[in-house]
């Protein structure tokens, strides 16, 4: 089993959004970084765990998620109405991938990055 970091701006998609999602599960879509895409497409496996990390003004780990569906084409790349549209993505050559994650555990309170930096 491998472990991953799932980073999100809390004003775009927060841990609370995941808590309120049906089945506390969501597709981790919209990633437009080639190395992260390759990890999702090739390396992330069902059952792997990850930290849900809020970036931004108050960076913190809000909880733990589990990958429940391995890499599959990111449909937002092919939707002109989506904020992550890529005109070069096609059904035959999707270019971008996503995984589905489910909430495992929330950290109350969340673990601030400043605390993590003080750990050996």
Question: What is the role of each PLM region?
Answer:
Residues 1-46:
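Compositionally biased, charged N-terminal/linker segments
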Residues 2, 61, 97:
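Residues that flank catalytic or metal-binding motifs in active/ligand-binding sites
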Residues 14-16, 59-63, 74-76:
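Short acidic/glycine-rich loop or secondary-structure boundary segments that cap or lie
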Residues 53-59:
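Short, charged beta-turn/beta-strand-edge "cap" motif at the junction between a beta-strand
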């Amino acid at each position: 089993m491998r472990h991953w970091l799932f980073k999100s701006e809390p004003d775009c998609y927060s841990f609370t959004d995941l808590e309120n999602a049906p089945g506390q599960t969501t597709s981790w879509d919209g990633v437009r970084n080639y190395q992260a895409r390759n990890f999702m497409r090739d390396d992330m496996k069902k059952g792997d765990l990850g930290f849900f990390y809020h970036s931004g003004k108050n960076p913190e780990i809000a909880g733990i998620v589990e990958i429940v569906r391995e890499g599959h084409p990111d449909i937002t790349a092919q939707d002109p109405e989506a904020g992550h549209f890529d005109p070069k993505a096609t059904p035959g050559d999707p270019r971008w991938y996503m995984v589905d994650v489910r909430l495992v555990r929330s950290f109350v309170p969340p673990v601030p990055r400043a605390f993590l930096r003080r750990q050996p």
